[in-house]
Curated annotation (Swiss-Prot):
CDD domains: RNaseZ_ZiPD-like_MBL-fold. Binds 2 Zn(2+) ions. PANTHER family: ZINC PHOSPHODIESTERASE ELAC PROTEIN 1. It is an enzyme of class 3 (hydrolase). Its cofactor is Zn(2+). The lineage of its organism: Bacteria, Pseudomonadati, Bacteroidota, Bacteroidia, Bacteroidales. Zn(2+) 1 binds at residues 63, 65, 143, 197. The gene is rnz. Belongs to the RNase Z family. Keywords: Endonuclease, Hydrolase, Metal-binding, Nuclease, tRNA processing, Zinc. This is Ribonuclease Z.
Amino acid sequence: MRQFEVNILGCGSALPATRHSLSSQIVNLNGELYMIDCGEGSQLQFRAMNLKFQRLNHIFISHLHGDHCFGLLGLVSMFVLLGRTVDLCIYSHPDTKCLFQPLIKYFFKELPFQVVFHPFDPTCSGLIFEDQVLRVFTIPLKHRVPTVGFLFEEKPIYLFDNNMQRGNFVTSGSQTVSSSCLSKLASFSCRYAYCSDTVYYEEIIPLITGVDLLYHEATYSNKDLARAKETYHSSAQQASLIARAANVKKLMLGHFSARYPDETFLLKEAQKIFPNTILASERMILPII
């Protein structure tokens, strides 16, 4: 049975608060885990949600602000204590390696696994990861530092004729028939887009059109638009405008400012424009399929 879901480890913004943890999510695709951002303390929520650490091999960091990456060292430490031996891959801005590799070498003299950094260009969209079931693309955003979102695209599943091997078929006349001609589409692929942090930025619309779920930052209320513009963040209403323009199926708001004791009014602001909107919350598990 297919599984494609998002686990929310943290949905707060930069200022630590008791109500929210800092930004981090886990995409669970058929039991394989992929982390998006790793704010301070993400390893605590990871364990609290009973996620399997041996299933997490790939981490995607949107940008180098502390509330999105300071948890990396703590996560590596947890993996060491739990006896990890499998390599850990981190996909991020090119500066990530020079910032974190010296710390990893200093604190972990004999690391039992490799931390492999995969840099990407944050100024353009591109494919940065692919395996048998998933493709991950970058979505350039507009923030105070180079920032990207991520598009997680499940590969479509095909069913083959039981009498055919999984490969090309050769007829008696030595004509090769592509395996795609011997299969049929069993399910359409699902897509999840993560966009945080960014100002209102219409350039992302073509990259996220029609996604099954869009996570878009909603740091501020529309009454604080001046502050949002100053800090290169978005309001809940602006997130809903992006969702509507991109014709997404569902919108999830997050990256909430600590100034608001309750985000319900942010939800109402967004739902006036895009009704199928929800608020992210810690330890939420949201199926995409």
